[in-house]
Amino acid sequence: EPSWQDWCVDFAPPDISTDSPIDQPNAQPWLAGRRIAIARDAAFSFIYPANLDCLRSMGAELCFFSPLEGDALPPCDALWLPGGYPELHAQALHANQVLRAGIGEHVAQGKPVWAECGGMLALCEGVTGLDGNIQAMWGLLPGQVIMQNRLGGLGMQQLVLDTGLLRGHTFHYTRLETTMQVHTRSSRPGAAVQPDRGEALYVHGSVRASYFHAWFPSNPAAVAGLFGATIQA
Protein backbone atom coordinates (compact mmCIF):
# COMPACT_ATOMS: atom_id res chain seq x y z
CA GLU A 1 0.00 0.00 0.00
CA PRO A 2 1.51 3.37 -1.00
CA SER A 3 2.30 5.93 1.64
CA TRP A 4 0.73 9.39 1.63
CA GLN A 5 4.09 10.82 0.53
CA ASP A 6 4.03 8.55 -2.53
CA TRP A 7 0.59 9.90 -3.37
CA CYS A 8 1.67 13.49 -2.80
CA VAL A 9 4.19 13.52 -5.65
CA ASP A 10 4.47 11.76 -8.98
CA PHE A 11 7.59 9.98 -7.81
CA ALA A 12 8.34 8.11 -4.59
CA PRO A 13 10.46 10.39 -2.39
CA PRO A 14 13.41 9.01 -0.44
CA ASP A 15 13.44 8.41 3.28
CA ILE A 16 12.15 11.72 4.66
CA SER A 17 14.05 11.17 7.91
CA THR A 18 17.28 12.04 6.10
CA ASP A 19 18.55 15.44 5.08
CA SER A 20 19.50 14.35 1.56
CA PRO A 21 18.07 16.71 -1.08
CA ILE A 22 15.58 15.42 -3.62
CA ASP A 23 14.70 16.61 -7.09
CA GLN A 24 11.95 19.22 -7.12
CA PRO A 25 9.45 18.83 -9.98
CA ASN A 26 8.69 21.93 -12.04
CA ALA A 27 10.40 24.31 -9.63
CA GLN A 28 11.41 27.71 -11.00
CA PRO A 29 13.15 30.63 -9.24
CA TRP A 30 9.87 32.13 -8.08
CA LEU A 31 11.31 32.90 -4.63
CA ALA A 32 14.68 34.25 -5.75
CA GLY A 33 15.72 37.16 -3.56
CA ARG A 34 13.18 36.34 -0.87
CA ARG A 35 14.17 35.53 2.70
CA ILE A 36 11.85 33.14 4.53
CA ALA A 37 12.03 32.92 8.32
CA ILE A 38 11.16 29.47 9.69
CA ALA A 39 10.41 28.66 13.32
CA ARG A 40 12.29 25.49 14.27
CA ASP A 41 12.58 24.03 17.77
CA ALA A 42 10.75 21.58 20.05
CA ALA A 43 7.50 23.53 19.61
CA PHE A 44 7.77 23.72 15.80
CA SER A 45 9.40 20.48 14.76
CA PHE A 46 7.19 19.12 11.99
CA ILE A 47 9.34 20.11 9.02
CA TYR A 48 10.08 17.75 6.14
CA PRO A 49 13.58 18.18 4.68
CA ALA A 50 11.97 17.90 1.24
CA ASN A 51 9.89 21.00 1.99
CA LEU A 52 13.06 22.94 2.77
CA ASP A 53 14.67 21.61 -0.40
CA CYS A 54 11.63 22.80 -2.35
CA LEU A 55 11.95 26.34 -1.02
CA ARG A 56 15.67 26.42 -1.75
CA SER A 57 15.11 25.07 -5.26
CA MET A 58 12.96 28.13 -5.95
CA GLY A 59 15.74 30.46 -4.84
CA ALA A 60 14.58 31.27 -1.31
CA GLU A 61 17.04 32.08 1.44
CA LEU A 62 16.00 30.25 4.61
CA CYS A 63 16.56 31.69 8.07
CA PHE A 64 15.75 29.53 11.11
CA PHE A 65 14.92 30.85 14.56
CA SER A 66 13.73 29.41 17.88
CA PRO A 67 10.70 30.95 19.58
CA LEU A 68 11.43 28.84 22.66
CA GLU A 69 14.93 30.28 22.98
CA GLY A 70 13.49 33.78 23.01
CA ASP A 71 14.55 34.67 19.47
CA ALA A 72 13.03 37.70 17.81
CA LEU A 73 11.67 37.44 14.29
CA PRO A 74 14.64 37.73 11.92
CA PRO A 75 14.46 40.24 9.05
CA CYS A 76 12.46 38.42 6.38
CA ASP A 77 10.05 38.72 3.48
CA ALA A 78 7.83 35.82 4.59
CA LEU A 79 7.29 33.65 7.66
CA TRP A 80 6.56 29.94 8.01
CA LEU A 81 5.26 28.66 11.34
CA PRO A 82 5.25 24.88 10.84
CA GLY A 83 3.48 22.20 12.81
CA GLY A 84 4.58 20.79 16.12
CA TYR A 85 3.38 20.90 19.70
CA PRO A 86 3.21 24.54 20.81
CA GLU A 87 0.51 23.63 23.33
CA LEU A 88 3.22 21.82 25.33
CA HIS A 89 5.28 25.01 25.46
CA ALA A 90 2.53 27.63 25.77
CA GLN A 91 4.04 29.45 28.74
CA ALA A 92 7.46 29.87 27.11
CA LEU A 93 5.96 30.90 23.78
CA HIS A 94 3.62 33.45 25.34
CA ALA A 95 6.55 34.89 27.27
CA ASN A 96 8.35 35.72 24.02
CA GLN A 97 6.58 39.04 23.54
CA VAL A 98 9.40 40.40 21.39
CA LEU A 99 8.62 37.73 18.81
CA ARG A 100 4.89 38.33 19.13
CA ALA A 101 5.41 42.03 18.45
CA GLY A 102 7.67 41.22 15.52
CA ILE A 103 5.11 38.92 13.92
CA GLY A 104 2.42 41.54 14.49
CA GLU A 105 4.53 44.15 12.69
CA HIS A 106 5.31 41.65 9.92
CA VAL A 107 1.58 41.13 9.37
CA ALA A 108 0.84 44.86 9.61
CA GLN A 109 3.27 45.37 6.73
CA GLY A 110 1.31 42.85 4.65
CA LYS A 111 4.09 40.28 4.55
CA PRO A 112 2.89 36.68 4.12
CA VAL A 113 2.66 34.13 6.91
CA TRP A 114 1.95 30.42 6.38
CA ALA A 115 0.82 28.97 9.73
CA GLU A 116 0.46 25.21 9.58
CA CYS A 117 -1.37 23.26 12.29
CA GLY A 118 0.74 23.95 15.40
CA GLY A 119 1.85 27.21 13.84
CA MET A 120 -1.78 28.26 13.60
CA LEU A 121 -2.36 27.25 17.22
CA ALA A 122 0.50 29.44 18.41
CA LEU A 123 -1.04 32.48 16.73
CA CYS A 124 -4.41 32.01 18.43
CA GLU A 125 -5.57 33.62 21.66
CA GLY A 126 -5.17 30.61 23.90
CA VAL A 127 -5.28 26.86 24.42
CA THR A 128 -7.82 25.16 26.68
CA GLY A 129 -6.36 21.96 28.10
CA LEU A 130 -8.16 18.73 28.91
CA ASP A 131 -8.31 19.95 32.51
CA GLY A 132 -10.12 23.12 31.46
CA ASN A 133 -7.21 25.41 32.20
CA ILE A 134 -6.54 28.11 29.61
CA GLN A 135 -3.01 29.04 28.58
CA ALA A 136 -2.50 32.24 26.64
CA MET A 137 -0.79 32.15 23.25
CA TRP A 138 0.20 35.05 20.96
CA GLY A 139 -3.30 36.33 20.25
CA LEU A 140 -2.66 37.36 16.65
CA LEU A 141 -5.53 35.25 15.31
CA PRO A 142 -9.01 35.32 16.86
CA GLY A 143 -9.91 31.99 18.34
CA GLN A 144 -9.44 29.48 21.10
CA VAL A 145 -7.81 26.08 20.65
CA ILE A 146 -9.54 23.24 22.51
CA MET A 147 -7.62 20.10 23.43
CA GLN A 148 -9.58 16.85 23.13
CA ASN A 149 -8.99 13.14 23.66
CA ARG A 150 -10.13 12.08 20.21
CA LEU A 151 -8.58 12.79 16.85
CA GLY A 152 -9.77 15.97 15.19
CA GLY A 153 -8.34 15.05 11.82
CA LEU A 154 -6.28 12.28 10.23
CA GLY A 155 -5.44 11.28 6.67
CA MET A 156 -4.41 12.40 3.23
CA GLN A 157 -5.79 15.72 2.01
CA GLN A 158 -5.59 18.10 -0.92
CA LEU A 159 -6.03 21.86 -0.86
CA VAL A 160 -6.92 23.89 -3.95
CA LEU A 161 -5.40 27.39 -3.99
CA ASP A 162 -5.53 30.12 -6.62
CA THR A 163 -2.13 28.93 -7.86
CA GLY A 164 -2.94 25.23 -7.95
CA LEU A 165 -3.55 22.09 -5.93
CA LEU A 166 -1.38 21.23 -2.93
CA ARG A 167 -1.27 17.75 -1.48
CA GLY A 168 -0.55 16.80 2.08
CA HIS A 169 -2.20 15.40 5.18
CA THR A 170 -3.83 16.24 8.48
CA PHE A 171 -3.23 14.95 12.00
CA HIS A 172 -4.38 16.74 15.15
CA TYR A 173 -6.12 16.26 18.49
CA THR A 174 -7.40 19.81 18.87
CA ARG A 175 -10.22 21.86 17.43
CA LEU A 176 -10.33 25.59 16.78
CA GLU A 177 -13.24 27.77 17.85
CA THR A 178 -12.94 31.01 15.90
CA THR A 179 -14.91 33.83 14.35
CA MET A 180 -12.68 33.78 11.26
CA GLN A 181 -14.46 33.01 8.02
CA VAL A 182 -13.44 29.87 6.16
CA HIS A 183 -11.73 30.79 2.89
CA THR A 184 -11.85 27.25 1.51
CA ARG A 185 -11.43 23.68 2.73
CA SER A 186 -9.21 20.74 1.99
CA SER A 187 -10.71 17.50 0.75
CA ARG A 188 -9.84 13.84 0.46
CA PRO A 189 -7.76 12.86 -2.60
CA GLY A 190 -9.76 13.39 -5.76
CA ALA A 191 -12.88 14.48 -3.88
CA ALA A 192 -14.79 17.73 -4.25
CA VAL A 193 -14.67 20.31 -1.48
CA GLN A 194 -17.58 19.99 0.96
CA PRO A 195 -18.72 22.74 3.33
CA ASP A 196 -18.58 20.55 6.45
CA ARG A 197 -15.61 18.31 5.66
CA GLY A 198 -11.85 18.69 5.44
CA GLU A 199 -9.61 21.27 7.05
CA ALA A 200 -10.48 24.95 6.90
CA LEU A 201 -8.09 27.44 5.34
CA TYR A 202 -8.34 30.79 7.09
CA VAL A 203 -7.11 34.06 5.59
CA HIS A 204 -6.66 36.81 8.17
CA GLY A 205 -4.83 39.80 6.77
CA SER A 206 -1.60 38.43 5.33
CA VAL A 207 -1.85 35.23 7.41
CA ARG A 208 -2.95 31.96 5.86
CA ALA A 209 -3.58 29.30 8.47
CA SER A 210 -4.86 25.74 8.47
CA TYR A 211 -4.56 22.35 10.13
CA PHE A 212 -3.49 21.12 6.68
CA HIS A 213 0.15 19.99 6.46
CA ALA A 214 1.42 20.71 2.94
CA TRP A 215 3.91 18.51 1.07
CA PHE A 216 5.67 21.30 -0.83
CA PRO A 217 7.08 19.20 -3.72
CA SER A 218 3.52 18.35 -4.79
CA ASN A 219 3.18 21.84 -6.31
CA PRO A 220 6.12 24.26 -5.95
CA ALA A 221 4.20 27.03 -7.73
CA ALA A 222 1.38 26.90 -5.20
CA VAL A 223 3.91 26.98 -2.38
CA ALA A 224 5.66 29.98 -3.91
CA GLY A 225 2.31 31.75 -3.92
CA LEU A 226 1.90 31.08 -0.20
CA PHE A 227 5.18 32.88 0.43
CA GLY A 228 4.39 35.94 -1.64
CA ALA A 229 5.48 35.14 -5.18
CA THR A 230 3.26 36.29 -8.03
CA ILE A 231 2.30 33.14 -9.92
CA GLN A 232 0.09 32.90 -12.97
CA ALA A 233 -2.44 30.14 -12.38
Where are these regions (language model features)?
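Amide-donor transfer/coupling interface in amidating biosynthetic enzymes
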Residues: 1-35, 145-233
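Short coil/turn connectors at secondary-structure junctions
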Residues: 33, 58-60, 75-76, 109-111, ...
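Structured core elements
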Residues: 37-38, 63-64, 80, 115, ...
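Short, glycine/charged-enriched secondary-structure capping and boundary segments
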Residues: 51-53, 93-96, 128-131, 184-185, ...
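Phosphate-binding active sites in nucleotide-utilizing proteins
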Residues: 28, 32-106
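Short, glycine-/Ser/Thr-/acidic-enriched flexible segments
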Residues: 42-44, 69, 85-87, 120-121, ...
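Short acidic (Asp/Glu) and glycine-rich catalytic loops that position anionic groups and cofactors
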Residues: 81-85, 119, 205-207
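Cysteine-nucleophile active-site neighborhood
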Residues: 62, 85-158
